[in-house]
């Protein structure tokens, strides 16, 4: 390139940039096709506050967990109704550019690659920003924690919950368990954060709520769930549901909550508990029963620490096999069963594992048992440990199992040559699809290592789950211990709801989303959505 050519190119570039910058300074959109300015209307916003609301471009519904950031780094996150109550004295009545981003949603970029919109915030006015949902599942609301409808309250709106700022004094809450018991939904969570001190409750928190009526629009969980927490009468903060006061060392986790009859035929609320030093090391484990008079769980049977599978786990389901009723355990794939009575649940000798292993190496399956046709020989038995998604993935990697024979390690519907390793989730019967549907967290996923959620189907609860469709994605945030609640299903099972723990833990991302971090977020999914066709079992 000659010097003349270089000078011409340099001047042309400067001229183009100058025109674009001048157009921006005058309030024009720099490149055709970029997002328009926010729609402004007079509305309910009152006092000193300007209302900025982010809405789904398809449904018109407010979108929670949307981050708006100004050029100078001020960040705002929408509440459960998709609202931000805005009052920055130096920015009112002035045009402000907000970068807009949200997990599983997108905002079109302008000519410079900025995904955002210009807003002129004025007290008493509403600015609507439209965003496009890319997730198959729709994010509805944050279920736990403080300030659920914080911005809506400031703006004078009436939220759908009796306590819109967060019941139970809870700041953060981890990993849900739920069961219908005595005409209520009983909810239990793991570690629970409080606002009054960095150390929270580490001995199980609990709450109840009415059983929702699928035909009653008022019981639609889209706006949240009206939890009635079990609280300490003095502090009003969530109290311990499994105190174990005589054994104060360690934290207590409660999992696999379900109901079964005892020897008198009385329904009992049961769960597996562990008292632990950390994520891996346990002090003790066992089966716990709910004491209705004390309203706490108490140990009913302690299990040997070396016992890894002859116990409840995951989100239990009931099913029939050959006319015999069973209780199934496993997360996300059901691979352990026991007769559904309290007496059987308390007896490790009554548990059976679903396996295709030839032998065990320690407490893990060693290699697959293949028949004369080269297919794995699956069976229920009492001696060998169960096979799960992680085991199948290892066998696939080692060439010991053919991809078409995988049962718990489905193909990625978008890239069938790749297999999806499932970490936690649930399998439920779906009356609309007339299939067992799996909603589970993927591990070793992208763009988030543990924040991608998958949907798959099977004719049996134990699979095979052939293809999995991504229904939720996160940008370097984690979404784990996913659970689909069948009692929240609507429209005959066409609409299902699931939740999970949203956090920056295990993501490699140091940024914590204010109020949302380490809390439960609810999604709904239309199982008839065209995007799920690749996962359907015909």
Task: Report residues per predicted region.
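Short, acidic Ser/Thr/Gly-rich low-complexity loop/linker segments typical of extracellular
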Residues: 73-88
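Extracellular beta-sheet/turn segments enriched in Thr/Pro/Gly and aliphatic residues
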Residues: 35-43, 114-135
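Bacterial N-terminal signal peptides
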Residues: 13-26
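Beta-strand-rich domain onsets/edges
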Residues: 30-50, 57
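Beta-rich carbohydrate-recognition and catalytic domains
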Residues: 126, 130-171, 180-250, 259-310, ...
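A short, solvent-exposed loop/turn motif at the edges and junctions
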Residues: 91-118
